[in-house]
């Protein structure tokens, strides 16, 4: 699931800045830094979520927030305050999505791996996700953007962003369904694992 999740996740890193600029958000690069600040907040909140909900539900929350973010980007814009708010909430959800999924997945990998193999396990996961997953995501992202290129520009927009983000969101929904059905973990262990890491 982590490999598959990294494929649509690459869309955010590839397209978010250009998308925000085209829909009329000034200083898009600066505003996107809010996503990094939100990572700090959600990192601090992660122990609470792990203790209360357990690893599986927190991982699921990371997937769901990623899909919601793309959903907000599908309908966001600068035409009115509501649409602008959706853009900013979408940016802020980057921290929730990244921390709740990838940091929690790292914790889970650490808990499940024998002590002498933890470093190797983390390296393998990083290679599969940020290496292969990101590579496939970048390739698919390029093809997606080409597919959704407008033949006639609509104002400043040269791409059908609704389609781009909708496609990304649909992949995340598919990954989420796979995760729900195939990720099996004892609920008691799931909660205790999170507690053990932060003690």
Positions of the model-derived regions?
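A membrane-interface helix-boundary motif in multi-pass transporters
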Residues: 142-172
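Loop-to-transmembrane helix entry
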Residues: 21-40, 85-86, 162
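C-terminal ends and interior cores of transmembrane alpha-helices
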Residues: 65-80
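Loop-to-transmembrane helix entry/capping segments in MFS-fold secondary transporters
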Residues: 26, 113-126
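Intracellular juxtamembrane helix-capping segments at the cytosolic ends
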Residues: 100-114
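Multi-pass alpha-helical transporter architecture, strongest
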Residues: 161-199
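Helix-loop boundary and gating motifs at the non-cytosolic
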Residues: 1, 5-33, 102-103, 138
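Helix-to-loop junctions at the C-terminal end of transmembrane segments
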Residues: 42-55, 145
